[in-house]
């Protein structure tokens, strides 16, 4: 009887906690703040300063994305900084950790920060990560790890993805650090984009802005330092690094960074708040103001989940310019929440004067890019959703260059050709290479059900 009594009270306590956790996780982030325009003012002030000498190239495919990361790490002589939303101990993830281990072995300081929720889900028991963290010159932290007493903090995630070498070169974009985005370790992979930036590192340069931002994230009080542990995985890291050098020796040995990149007029970083808390939509506000500078805007995003404020911003933009969105068709998308929300909200989006290219290409589009006029390109981690606007840390890089803009517009043509264009006037057009894909009935039923069930938590999506 005593045991049953204890179990009964444990069950009650668990039920009370779950009620508390769900209630606070859903309702604490509900009040959405308003932007002050501060980020936009900072951006405008940087435009008036002397432009730093920076060069850029886009990275479009998964093999190049992994190789450029390995090259960047191998080039480091002083320090490597690595920030990512989702690192896993799979093929490409182990390649990256082996390269970081190799850098640390030759005396390079290595700092790694991973989102705490994904770190818990995928790396908490990773011997590879522990072996890397055990190296003398390496420090690994989880951003805002799970806090059972404050469950609402689960909503505030580190969504930045960048890699910096020696404060002079970096890769930044939308790719996570696993086989879905890097290398060719698996067949089904997402479509995404990074940019490589080579800089003189001068005051006011985008790399100096990124370094300042990183330090603010790195020093957040909630972060948890991961304890290293030497094990058989230490030898495995050494062996993997040696194998990488053997396979990619020529590519890793010497890179002419100037030849591999193109000069641009200006590069500037737009960043949201680094704190794990509900955020004012300063980054969204800055992006809207940027889009207002062009008469032709192409917004590439995996999905669209907007509140009334964001819808109104899009509507105001569409009144005086062509505003097109390039996103996944429901039958092509990989995010159930995004797909189900689009099923319900499609007509609302179109009614705002926005035309939508619905991509059907067999691979999920994960690219976050805004092409404005013929000279502005914005690339980074920001999705056109409330999570990016109000909850997560996000980065977008603004590149002023007609050459880069033209190249990225040309890159988008292959996906436009495989799209169904939903016009705001109710019409539909089809790309030259569009092929209809049937959405399985089970998925359609799931998405339809989710579109109703997730209404109470749309602000968290």
Give residue ranges: language-model regions.
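Charged, low-complexity intrinsically disordered terminal segments
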Residues: 2-138, 148-158, 165, 169-461
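Lumenal/extracellular "mature" regions of secretory-pathway glycan-modifying transferases
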Residues: 141-143
């Amino acid at each position: 009887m005593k045991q049953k009594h204890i179990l009964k009270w444990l069950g009650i306590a668990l039920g009370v906690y779950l009620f508390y956790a769900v209630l606070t996780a859903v309702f604490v982030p509900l009040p959405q703040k308003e932007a002050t325009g501060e980020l936009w003012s900072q951006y405008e002030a940087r435009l008036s300063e002397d432009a730093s000498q920076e060069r850029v190239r886009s990275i479009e495919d998964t093999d190049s994305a992994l190789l450029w990361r390995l090259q960047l790490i191998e080039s480091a002589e002083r320090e490597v900084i690595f920030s990512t939303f989702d690192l896993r101990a799979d093929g490409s993830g182990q390649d990256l950790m082996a390269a970081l281990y190799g850098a640390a072995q030759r005396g390079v300081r290595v700092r790694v920060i991973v989102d705490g929720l994904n770190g818990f889900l995928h790396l908490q028991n990773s011997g590879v990560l522990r072996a890397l963290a055990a190296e003398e010159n390496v420090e690994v932290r989880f951003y805002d790890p799970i806090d059972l007493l404050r469950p609402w903090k689960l909503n505030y995630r580190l969504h930045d993805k960048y890699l910096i070498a020696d404060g002079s070169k970096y890769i930044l974009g939308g790719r996570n650090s696993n086989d879905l985005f890097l290398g060719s370790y698996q067949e089904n992979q997402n479509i995404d984009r990074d940019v490589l930036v080579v800089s003189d590192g001068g005051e006011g340069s985008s790399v100096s802005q990124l370094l300042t931002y990183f330090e603010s994230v790195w020093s957040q009080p909630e972060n948890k330092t991961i304890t290293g542990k030497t094990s058989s995985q230490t030898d495995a890291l050494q062996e993997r690094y040696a194998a990488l050098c053997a396979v990619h020796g020529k590519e890793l040995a010497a890179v002419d960074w100037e030849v591999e990149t193109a000069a641009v007029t200006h590069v500037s970083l737009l960043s949201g708040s680094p704190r794990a808390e509900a955020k004012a939509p300063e980054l969204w506000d800055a992006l809207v103001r940027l889009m207002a500078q062009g008469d032709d805007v192409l917004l590439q995003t995996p999905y669209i989940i907007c509140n009334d404020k964001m819808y109104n911003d899009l509507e105001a933009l569409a009144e005086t310019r062509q505003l097109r969105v390039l996103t996944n068709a429901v039958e092509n998308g990989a995010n159930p929440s995004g797909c189900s929300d689009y099923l319900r909200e499609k007509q609302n989006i179109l009614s705002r004067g926005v035309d939508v290219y619905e991509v059907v290409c067999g691979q999920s589009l994960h690219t976050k890019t805004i092409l404005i006029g013929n000279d502005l390109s914005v690339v980074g981690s920001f999705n056109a959703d409330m999570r990016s606007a109000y909850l997560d840390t996000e980065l977008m890089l603004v590149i002023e260059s007609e050459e880069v803009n033209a190249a990225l517009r040309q890159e988008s043509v292959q996906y436009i050709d495989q799209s169904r264009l939903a016009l705001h006037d109710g019409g539909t057009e089809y790309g030259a290479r569009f092929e209809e894909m049937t959405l399985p009935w089970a998925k359609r039923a799931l998405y339809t059900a989710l579109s109703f069930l997730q209404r109470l938590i749309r602000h968290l999506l």
